[in-house]
Amino acid sequence: MRALMKGALACLLAACGEGDAEVSCGPASGRVAEVLDGDTVVLESGERVRYLLADAPERTGAGGDCFGPEAHAFNRGLVEGRRVTLTYGEACEDRFGRLLAYVSVEEREVNTLLVERGHACVLHVPPAGRSRRAEFQALEAQARLARRGVWGACAPVPCQR
């Protein structure tokens, strides 16, 4: 009876997770076909993916934003043509229909790298990213204090307008 109960508990934990249920919104991985800007990519499968909690300066438009080309180049150097892993948060898509995900390449999470190196600011649009918001805000505060990226190059900082 005890073995049966342990087995049932193991199955329940496997099925339900241990309180850290991940949302499955799209593919778990894919190859990046195109880097649109500092915080958005297109996979070979056609899905557009917006990085959760990272808001990079725009590189297009009326002259683009300060540090937009640098953020785009940094992102391209990390992910273009490479296989990435996608982890989803509390929401699957933004209002433009893009998948919202934490994107990793070779065990490095691109979202956190962008914020900690000053290539992006934190953007929290509830509920997406709620569980990791404080972590990203701490990374942004460190980048701001060290005047990395946008924090040293731009006045005003594009994502602070």
Regions found by a protein language model. Give the residues of each.
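Small beta-barrel nucleic-acid-binding modules, primarily SNase/OB-fold domains
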Residues: 2, 6, 12-161
